[in-house]
Amino acid sequence: MHFNSNFKECFNKIAKKVNSLDSEYYEFSSFIERIRTTFGLLIALTVLSNLIIISFVLIWFFTDGFGQLRLLFFTLFIPFFISLLVAIFLIFLNNSFRNFFQINEKNWLFLWTCVFSSLPIFNLWLIVRLNKTIKNFASDYGFKIVNKYNSLTSGIFVFDFADYVSFEANLTNWKNTNDKNRNFVNFFETISKEKTGVVQKPVLNFQRLYVNRLYYQSKLSVGSNQQTPQTAFDNLRNYVENKQRETVRVKQYILT
């Protein structure tokens, strides 16, 4: 309380000094106008940045495989509530500022421009700050599996959040050891076919398992250490199952 009293006394002295000298008061008012103009220009940035944020989340939400509600909560609602708290804090500060320096009611525009112009800077900073965290949550467990050629061929497309690398290939017939097209293992459809006898499309959320690019490159190519495609497939299946056990508890809660 004592500190708060001294703080108010200090501001009162500054306010009296500003109001006692006309020249300083007008100079200060001009400074306020310049600040208000600057913040007014940032309103356009506010609208643009928040539209970008909302568009990003909507695209993510309505894309097959990334429509999980918890992930939407972490990427949209937490930044929104934090921005709201920042806005309330700025309103309090600017209200005190207006009272101490006796700014007229018409200068409420200055208050609101301060509040709204703070949002784009804060939101953009928050996206940069959370980008690595969101990427880590999504990279190990989130994959979008779609039929690239609309079922006209057996080609498939995989989008990898981890390194933005896509793989294109035809489905491999593991019984045919002469098949040279072994550059992709369709683990998901193979598992569903073994369980039900029917290739399951689309792949369920809990079947989106982790496939590592380096493992793909080193283990799935036919070489001295890979005598048959079945060996490569078994190694991949073991790797995926082990990786899933390590990540499923945390990431299934976040992404499902």
Curated annotation (Swiss-Prot):
Topological category with respect to the lipid bilayer: Multi-pass membrane protein
Subcellular compartments: Cell membrane
UniProt source species: Mycoplasma genitalium (strain ATCC 33530 / DSM 19775 / NCTC 10195 / G37)
Keyword Transmembrane assigned: yes
Protein's name according to its UniProt entry: Uncharacterized protein MG256
GO cellular-component term (any): plasma membrane
Broad class of the protein's primary localization: membrane
Keyword Transmembrane found: yes
Origin: domain of life: Bacteria
Swiss-Prot/TrEMBL keywords: Cell membrane, Membrane, Transmembrane, Transmembrane helix
Annotated transmembrane regions: 42-62, 73-93, 108-128
